[in-house]
């Protein structure tokens, strides 16, 4: 595939997914592998571009005061601690059954996000203690599931923040982006210790990823309502659930 096509795809993925609290990795990694990039190159490039898009969007969300750091920090810490536990447990559980259950839960969350007509208040208050404890517990769940399945945990953050902690959708998406910055770059550092990335490609692609993250975050912050964000994210969840189902049955 020509770079004239690939680089706009990087921009588009960053634009769409940063609006809903993700960085683009759901698209980058399978796209690069489909284009027959070496696996380590595909994964490291995906993580780096994911981090760049998330960092770009996080700048906007912090300026708009949309990030809830009191939830984000304990979530980052606890998910980092529990991801190795999930990886260690991989050989001790029935992964096919666990993945099937997870896919079913994600499908339900996707349906609720897409079809729910319930309005929300962007001014709903949550106690500081509730935020810290809830963020820590959610981080444990996300880290464990991510380590167990070998997938990024970002796709779980937004629905858990919305439906468990009752965080307004826009705040949940912005806080998720803040978390994705740390998880992406830490994963990238681990991968470059194994294999050298294609710096020429990822630095050029990073310009498009950064631009997409800027545009996506500005559109979300200034134009999109919570209900619209939930529906876009629900569509992303639906695609992710179908990928998990494919992993179970194929």
PLM feature spans:
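Residue-level recognition of specific faces of alpha-helices
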Residues: 18, 31, 51-54, 147, ...
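Transmembrane helix-bundle signature of multi-pass membrane transporters/permeases
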Residues: 43-51, 80, 173-181, 206, ...
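Juxtamembrane transmembrane-helix boundary motif
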Residues: 1-18, 29-35, 39, 60-145, ...
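Membrane-helix boundary/interface segments in integral membrane proteins
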Residues: 187-192
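Early transmembrane hairpin of solute transport permeases
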Residues: 30, 34, 41-58
């Amino acid at each position: 595939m020509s770079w004239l096509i690939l680089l706009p795809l990087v921009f588009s993925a960053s634009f769409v997914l940063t609006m809903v609290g993700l960085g683009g990795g759901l698209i980058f990694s399978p796209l690069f592998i489909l284009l027959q990039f070496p696996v380590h190159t595909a994964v490291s490039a995906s993580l780096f571009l994911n981090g760049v898009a998330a960092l770009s969007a996080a700048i906007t969300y912090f300026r708009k005061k949309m990030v809830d750091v009191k939830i984000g920090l304990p979530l980052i810490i606890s998910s980092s601690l529990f991801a190795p536990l999930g990886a260690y447990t991989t050989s001790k559980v029935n992964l096919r059954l666990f993945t099937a259950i997870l896919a079913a839960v994600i499908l339900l969350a996707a349906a609720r996000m897409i079809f729910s007509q319930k309005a929300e208040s962007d001014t709903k208050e949550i106690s500081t203690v509730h935020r810290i404890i809830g963020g820590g517990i959610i981080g444990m769940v996300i880290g464990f599931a991510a380590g167990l399945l070998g997938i990024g945990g970002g796709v779980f953050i937004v629905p858990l923040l919305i439906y468990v902690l009752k965080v307004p959708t826009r705040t949940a998406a912005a806080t998720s982006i803040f978390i994705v910055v740390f998880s992406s770059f830490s994963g990238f550092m681990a991968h470059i210790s194994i294999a050298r990335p294609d710096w020429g490609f990822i630095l050029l692609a990073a310009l498009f990823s950064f631009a997409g993250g800027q545009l996506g975050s500005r559109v979300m912050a200034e134009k999109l309502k919570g209900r619209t964000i939930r529906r876009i994210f629900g569509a992303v969840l639906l695609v992710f659930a179908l990928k998990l189902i494919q992993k179970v049955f194929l």
